[in-house]
Amino acid sequence: MSETTTIAAAGTTTQPRFAAFNAAGNAVALGAEDHVITRDTSTGLEYTAAGQRGDYLEHDPAMQACTAVAIAGGGWRAPTRAELIAITDITRHAPAIDAEAFPFVSDDWYWSSDLTAWSSSSAWGVYFNYGGVDGAHRGDDGFALAVRRAGQ
């Protein structure tokens, strides 16, 4: 079952943490066949429900793949380290992410847009097998999720 988040507005209500949308931007059930966008209702960010298809990518091509996403109007970019950490769930394993909200994310390395402080040749990422966060050489291979502010 997917997480819930308590949101205080005019009183307190409980709503699902994640919501799913199809390529046209219409709401669908989490995990539906046409679920391609996952909205984090606690942050207002939307993520692609899957990483790029196919082979692993080095950091720069992964960043380019994120900005090339054209689902539901575009406006996509690579996530920051903090944005990837925000969707990581260390109570889960292989993958360490809500698999209902992100049904096509594998338990592998996903790049962030943030470079490490110790070297511009390295960038941060999350290993969704167990939720580890680390820096890796930008020539190493990984996957990418794209992110944007909801409503773009």
Residue ranges and their predicted role:
Residues 1-77, 81-152:
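Glycine-aromatic-enriched surface loops/turns that form tight recognition elements
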